[in-house]
């Protein structure tokens, strides 16, 4: 089996997404030290919901598609989310968030849309849909995490342990691209529609940007924040 078709599909999707990507105002604010600490708390609380959801979604995908290479990819992603959750705990502690603050956090729709769509894909998507969407989103997510980690160190006094969650996601695990392409190709070989994968990638990228845009609402003069509980993190 060759992966030429998968590579061409992913390349085309990445080129399309590059034309739609907009500035990430929240990451820019963190990078320059202008994001309020309460918005960092909102980021942590949002991820405390997103990461376990993604972990369950990937575990479900591994059960839906147990045969290699898909089963291997999705199981490894579920395990990786488990590691990420432990790193996230260090970020939460560095911000001084206690159990009461976390439990009173009111989730924002824009911050949970990404995880909700990943869960939808886990239930309804094909293996190539999921793999293309994740591979295409990888560059943006990784670059955002790298910039946040650097900004947190430089401007907020957080050490490597505290920013480990973002450093963990700043680069893909070894072999992830190759394994992902193999999953895409196996789906294409089985007759899965390339356009469905393109559509999934576009939607996931929109939801990725919506996550960060929601965190930046009211800080950049663009948009208006959604209602949330008084005194709680966004």
Language-model segments: which ranges?
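Alpha-helical bundle segments that constitute or directly flank the non-heme di-iron/ferroxidase center
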Residues: 12-21, 27-64, 124, 129-146, ...
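Secondary-structure edge/capping motif, primarily at the C-terminal ends of alpha-helices
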Residues: 61-65, 152, 156, 187, ...
């Amino acid at each position: 089996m060759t992966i030429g078709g998968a590579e061409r599909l992913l390349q085309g999707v990445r080129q399309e997404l590059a034309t739609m990507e907009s500035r990430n105002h929240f990451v820019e604010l963190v990078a320059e030290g202008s994001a309020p600490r309460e918005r960092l708390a909102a980021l942590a609380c949002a991820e405390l919901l997103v990461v376990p959801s993604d972990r369950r979604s990937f575990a479900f995908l591994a059960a839906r598609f147990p045969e290699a290479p898909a089963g291997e990819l999705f199981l490894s992603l579920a395990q990786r989310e488990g590691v990420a959750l432990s790193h996230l705990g260090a970020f939460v502690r560095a911000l001084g968030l206690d159990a009461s603050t976390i439990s009173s956090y009111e989730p924002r729709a824009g911050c949970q849309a990404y995880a909700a769509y990943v869960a939808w894909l886990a239930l309804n998507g094909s293996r190539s849909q999921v793999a293309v969407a994740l591979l295409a989103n990888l560059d943006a997510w990784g670059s955002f995490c790298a910039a946040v980690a650097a900004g947190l160190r430089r401007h907020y006094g957080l050490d490597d342990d505290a920013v480990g969650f973002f450093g963990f996601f700043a680069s893909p695990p070894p072999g992830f691209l190759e394994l992902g392409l193999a999953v895409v190709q196996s789906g294409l070989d089985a007759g899965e529609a390339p356009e469905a994968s393109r559509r999934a990638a576009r939607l996931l990228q929109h939801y990725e940007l919506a996550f960060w845009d929601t965190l930046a609402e009211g800080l950049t003069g663009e948009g208006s924040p959604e209602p949330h509980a008084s005194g709680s993190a966004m």
